Amino acid sequence: TEEEYRKNLTEEDLFNEFTQDENGNVVMSREDGMKKIKKLGGFDKLYRIKLEADYLAKLAYEGAKKRYGDPLDDETAERIKFELHIMKTMGFPGYFLIVQDYIRAGRGSAAGSAVAYCLGITQIDPIKYDLLFERFLNPDRISLPDIDVDFDDDGRGRVLNWVTQKYGADNVAHIITYGTMATKLAIKDVARVQKLPLSISNNLCKLIPDKLPEGPDGKVPKMNLTNAIAAIPELREAETSSDILLRDTIRYAKMLEGNVRNTGVHACGFIICRDNISDWVPVSTAKDKETGEELHCTQYEGRVIEETGLIKMDFLGLKTLSIIKEALENIKLSLGIDLNIDEISIEDPATYQLYCDGRTIGTFQFESPGMQKYLRELQPSTFEDLIAMNALYRPGPMQYIPSFIARKHGDEPITYDLPCMEKYLKDTYGITVYQEQVMLLSREIANFTRGESDALRKAMGKKLIEKLNHMYPKFIDGGKANGHDPKVLEKIWNDWRAFASYAFNKSHATCYSWVAYQTAYLKANYPSQYMAGVMSRSLADINTVAKLMDECKSMGISTLGPDINESYLKFSVNHSGDIRFGMGAVKGVGESAVLQILAERKKNGVYKSVYDLVERVNLSTCNKKSLESLALAGAFDSFGNITREQFVTPCENGETFLDALVRYG
């Protein structure tokens, strides 16, 4: 307990632990150490951090045994020890304890943390894929940790409810967002109040360009009404018009532009606090757009929240995870197999063949026609190939893809400016693809520290010329000290400067590629079950469903129409391996009607006829409109005796068979 720590540890013990490195070496002066302690909240707070850090270490080492085996090799043990020490000395162990408590699939830079991997926060081994911890948490760059957590669309709400119940409704809050008046919106709002004719208001808005022309200094001015008036003669005329309504509209729009117009709720941001959140920030309520319920909200937006010291958690809903979940349910239902998607082989031949053939429609990240073309040319054979393609297939680095493909097939020589560079560029055939490669190579070539390599990555990515000019001599001097030719070092530096702004975060690319691989694995090995899952998540988009049905046809999978005794709410797979249309995808059939049909079918068996159906279901829920839509879609074809047209064709008395059927029911 915290009390026991207070009895057994002196302030001097804590000072040493929090100001030395992970190996007990003194790395800062007494004065700097005291500043650091003060920044962490003083010695009183350190007892709590130490308690949390020790518990975090216990969980991490337990997880490490499962992930890496027992005993740990030296590299892994050193990595975990270093990460735990940084987390502790930056005051963040409590954050990781909370995240591992509710996590399912973290992504982003957190994938660079071996501790996060051991805790089950991420599913990618950062040591195996050269993902860097300091890309996530850098001791030289005091910034709050940020783990984006992806949940399937249905699971996100459940997790938020669980977090609210666990930590208390008064201790958690969503984050407010403020919508401001943009240039065109300011004009429209003022024109409406001024009763300016709509045609004139629309004409004014049409005069506002999407982008202003370059000024005399060669820079593009910021888009606002003042700058637009300076650039557009017609707007200048409106500003000085003899028409008072027109003139005032411009005048008031200039005053109101940029002001807050409305509020909303941050799509994924969430605050968890140890105390009542209103003790830290002002709170309010806001309506959830989807459910209409009142949500507890901060009155500060995200960037201000961080300045208060509270940590923002991101709970994201990812449609792809919902598709994977649907596919796994279909596999269980149709084949009786409980597949653990996180334990599939990363070297599955069928999956790589699918990528080599470019058959990626319906999979994550790799389904665009351009990507399919490059995959067929590349013939990926390793997971590293997929990560690289994911990182390269974006504006800018896309120009390197032909060279990447040629080098893989031996059509272009793979060269390294220095032999030591092969270690980190081998997997990408000598091409610098990731920010992490620049960081690792700067350490290898010029003895940059972890913090310095991250600062270099940031400076190159954001083209911070002054910072780069400051770091250049250190790179050259460090490289010369290691015996490297200054001319070669200069070439490497210039190559990095040219490409680093395009270089992608490998942690992100790896996480996304892993989810993409999972979808491709399911499509390659359980095609019917996977495609049914994809279509189920596009129920409302008939064009997408039609495209996916064409893909199923090309795969040799039949997509059967809806059937009252075989269909479910969503698309499913029958005993023959065919996909059966979901009744929920039939236009005009509500979800409640389908659930009523399914509940009765489960309870009392299949329906023997349409008469049996209307006798057994609640016709106020499953009404005439639903029955008509199902009949015309062919859901009753299996009963025989009556065609679809006969359900809606009037008899001699003007009544349709469907009317009589409902009356009978």
Outline where the language-model segments fall.
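Alpha-helical scaffold/interaction cores of sigma-54-like transcription cofactors
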Residues: 1-665
